[in-house]
């Protein structure tokens, strides 16, 4: 390396680094992966069997403010972005699942965020959802998780063990499918063939006139 070469060090965030160390020490083996984005945010991924105790531990560490909980479907959409020309053959799409920050091993995950109200520090918690498509409820830990879990169950089909009432909030009880899954077909995703194609429908009587002309 010459004297003119410089190395760029990754930015450090001592405050969040110290807080992440405190969190991972408290959670122990439950933490599968963690990430601190300097001057931005913190992420952890925990084992499914420690999901509820993770919430309890974080609350005891001062993360008493529940922000949100939802599901993630990492499957690349088989419909693409709905921007292709419908008259052209369907292009080949990459079906590789990439789970984002702190990784993962499953198509579906649950993500939640909690904060310390007096320090502005927050942490995002992810957990893999296996084929049982269920995880323990956080309702007994954070009351605000109630309707977030209901919505996640309704839109992704992820169950929450111990939840007092997982009835649908938006959809009819007999609705089939889960609208926020990537493989759920939404007609609104399909680009209408305009202005490249003009779809002309025959007017009433056109068929008769064509028959007379022949």
Task: Describe the predicted segments one by one.
Residues 1-214:
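Terminal low-complexity/charged segments
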């Amino acid at each position: 390396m010459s004297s003119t070469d410089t190395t760029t060090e990754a930015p450090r965030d001592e405050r969040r680094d110290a807080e992440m160390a405190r969190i991972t020490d408290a959670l122990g083996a439950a933490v599968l992966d963690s990430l601190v984005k300097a001057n931005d945010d913190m992420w952890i991924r925990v084992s499914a069997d420690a999901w509820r105790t993770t919430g309890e531990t974080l609350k005891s560490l001062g993360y008493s403010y529940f922000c949100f909980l939802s599901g993630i479907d990492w499957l690349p959409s088989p419909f693409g972005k709905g921007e292709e020309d419908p008259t052209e053959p369907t292009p080949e799409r990459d079906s590789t699942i990439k789970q984002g920050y702190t990784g993962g091993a499953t198509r579906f995950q649950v993500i939640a965020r909690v904060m310390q109200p007096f320090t502005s520090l927050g942490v995002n918690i992810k957990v893999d959802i296996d084929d049982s498509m269920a995880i323990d409820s956080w309702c007994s830990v954070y009351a605000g998780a109630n309707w977030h879990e209901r919505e996640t169950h309704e839109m992704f089909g992820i169950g929450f063990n111990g939840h007092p009432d997982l009835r649908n909030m938006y959809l009819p009880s007999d609705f089939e499918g889960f609208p926020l899954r990537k493989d759920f077909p939404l007609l609104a995703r399909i680009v209408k063939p305009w202005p490249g194609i003009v779809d002309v429908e025959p007017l009433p009587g056109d068929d008769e006139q064509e028959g007379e002309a022949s």
